[in-house]
């Protein structure tokens, strides 16, 4: 069945599987990643996209920021928030690279059109 998945579907499956790879099987708290496992995940899985993944204080700060319910563990929704926080700047970076490859004039025209639309919406 996995062979028929699209690239996007495969990417979602990888993200979900990655979460459960770091959930402790022996924990009393099910379906959550402990601080130590989360630090391991950052170091092993996101060391190219996030800076200071080996820095314990930086990892603990990220955990604190993600841990919406303040239980000291990362649930799937909190993990997904982190993924969104990574992908949004990545999307902007990819778009900037695409703009550099296209003619600057086309990107400027697109940007001007967007600005005009925003100003028209703002004056409405």
Swiss-Prot record:
This protein's record includes keyword Metal-binding: yes
One Pfam short name: S_100
Residues where Ca(2+) binds: 67, 69, 71, 73, 78
GO BP annotations listed: response to calcium ion
Cell compartments where the protein resides: Nucleus, Nucleolus; Cytoplasm
SMART domains noted in UniProt: S_100
Chain spans, region Disordered: 97-124
Family matches, as SUPFAM superfamilies: EF-hand (SSF47473)
Residue ranges of every copy of the EF-hand domain listed in the record: 23-37, 54-89
Entry superkingdom: Eukaryota
Coiled coil feature spans: none
Alphabetized UniProt keyword annotations: Calcium, Cytoplasm, Metal-binding, Nucleus, Repeat, Zinc
Entry GO MF terms: calcium ion binding; identical protein binding; protein homodimerization activity
Domain comment (free text): S100A16 proteins, but not other S100 proteins, have only one functional Ca(2+) binding site per monomer. Upon Ca(2+) binding, undergoes conformational changes leading to the exposure of hydrophobic patches which could be implicated in the Ca(2+)-dependent nuclear export. Binds Zn(2+). Ca(2+) and Zn(2+) do not bind to the same site. Does not bind Cu(2+).
Subunit-level organization: Homodimer. Interacts with TP53.
PANTHER family: PROTEIN S100-A16, S100 CALCIUM-BINDING PROTEIN
Functional description taken from the UniProt entry: Calcium-binding protein. Binds one calcium ion per monomer. Can promote differentiation of adipocytes (in vitro). Overexpression in 3T3-L1 preadipocytes increases their proliferation, enhances adipogenesis and reduces insulin-stimulated glucose uptake.
Protein name: Protein S100-A16
Record organism: Mus musculus
């Amino acid at each position: 069945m996995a062979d028929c998945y699209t690239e996007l579907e495969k990417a979602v499956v990888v993200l979900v599987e990655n979460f459960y790879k770091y959930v402790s099987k022996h924990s009393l708290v099910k379906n959550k990643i402990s601080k130590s496992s989360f630090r391991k995940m950052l170091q092993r899985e996101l060391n190219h996209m996030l800076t200071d993944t080996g820095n314990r204080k930086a990892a603990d700060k990220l955990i604190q920021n993600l841990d919406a319910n303040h239980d000291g563990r990362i649930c799937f929704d909190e993990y997904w928030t982190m993924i969104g926080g990574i992908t949004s700047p990545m999307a902007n970076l990819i778009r900037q690279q695409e703009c550099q490859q296209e003619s600057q004039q086309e990107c400027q025209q697109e940007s001007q059109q967007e600005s005009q639309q925003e100003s028209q919406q703002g004056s409405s």
